[in-house]
Structure formats: structure tokens, C-alpha cells
Amino acid sequence: MANSVFWAIAVALVLGAEAYMPLDYRCGVKPKSRDNCGPPGISPDECVKKGCCFDDSDPDSIWCYTPWKFEDTICNPAEPKARVNCGYPGITSQDCDKKGCCFNDTIPNVVWCYQPIIEAVERDCSAVEPKKRVNCGPPGVSPDECIKNGCCFNSDVGGVPWCFKPEIKKELLQCAVLPKARINCGYPDITMDQCYKKGCCYDSSESDSIWCFYPDIEDVTIIE
């Protein structure tokens, strides 16, 4: 969630309130779901240079962690009432598409230009039991070399590979999260831009709800 990460932003206007979703929220990983991407004490700059995300707002979580890897965007017109607006009144399909959003005007009385679901791939190191680790590097491989090759590194357990293959999960992420189900990703008075830089979703259409929140994992499929 560092400032040097570039973002593609999808902008929407809902009844005069701000409601936005960053299409590239690769660092929007919930604290409890993070996989370590650097050694203890790594600086924000060093973390980002490694292609990782850095966020130290939660003292009990991993600060330098592996980002989401995006595969595709998905438009799902099967749930029209759950659509999250991504345009303005009268927006054309061409302008909607340029924003990285979905357009479907076949159903009346619902949003036509709406935010897509993001298909991402997650490398989950914590899901691999030590006895089930599959070696992913040569003897003596360094933590940096191991991680750079897309593998996991953990030297806490003896007699098992320290550099090993992660569990690969395909997940669907979205910002269409009900207010009561949102997990806070910000702090009081956080701005829209500050929220985006943290890789999170922003929706200020309801004054008494969390405005800056983590994208929701809709579906998980283990592919490797």
C-alpha cells in the first residue's frame, strides 16, 4: 500500500455522493490474509522495490506483504440489483468501457454502468503444512531469491524445505460489500485518494457506514 504504486481508478457518481472502486487494488489484502514478502525491519522503499506492498497501520499484521496478482475483470449481469455504480447519468457504453467498467442496459431501473468483479490469483504460503511442502529452490537459496521466483520461504521448521511452493488460489474480488459487512481499511477522515493508495474500496454514499474498506473475496478456487 505504498505511495509509489500506480493505480487505475474507476470513478462513479451515485446520487451526488462519491462511490469509487480502484480497478487495480493489488495491495488491498486484509491484514489477516497477508503473506510475508520481506525480512524483519525492511523499509517501505525496500519493500516496494521488491514488488511488494507495505502497510504498517496494523501493528499486529505483516507490514511488507505479497500483492494480489490480477488475471481478468468479470462482468456479471446476473445480479443486477447488486451492481455498484461506475458512471454518471447518461454515460455511453464506450465511455463506461474506457473507465474499465461494465455496461449492460437491457434491464430497466438498475445501474447500467457498473463496477466489475476482479479475478485475482493469490499465493497462500500459510495454507501449506510443513510436512506437505514441495521444494521450490536449490540448496542454500536465499529468502529474496526464493520469493523472487514466486515461492515461499520459512525457516522456522527443521527437516522440511524452507523454500517451497505456495498454494495457488483463484479468487473473485469486489467492492460491492454491504455496509454492515465492511472491514475498515482506513482511519477517521481518510480521503478518497488516501484510501485508493492503500489499495482499498471507497464508498461515501451512506454517512453512517465505513467509507474506506477492504475488497471482499466472493469466491475461492484452489487451482494448484
Curated annotation (Swiss-Prot):
It comes from the Eukaryota. Residues 25-68, 73-117, 123-167, 173-216 form the P-type domain. Stomach mucosa. The keyword Transcription regulation does not apply. PROSITE patterns: P_TREFOIL_1 (PS00025), P_TREFOIL_2 (PS51448). GO terms for molecular function: growth factor activity. InterPro entries: P_trefoil_chordata (IPR017994), P_trefoil_CS (IPR017957), P_trefoil_dom (IPR000519), P_trefoil_dom_sf (IPR044913). GO terms for cellular component: extracellular space. Glycans are attached at residue 104. Disulfide bonds join 27-53, 37-52, 47-64, 75-102, 86-101, 96-113, 125-152, 136-151, 146-163, 175-201, 185-200, 195-212. May act as a growth factor. This is Putative gastrointestinal growth factor xP4. It comes from Xenopus laevis. The lineage of its organism: Eukaryota, Metazoa, Chordata, Craniata, Vertebrata.
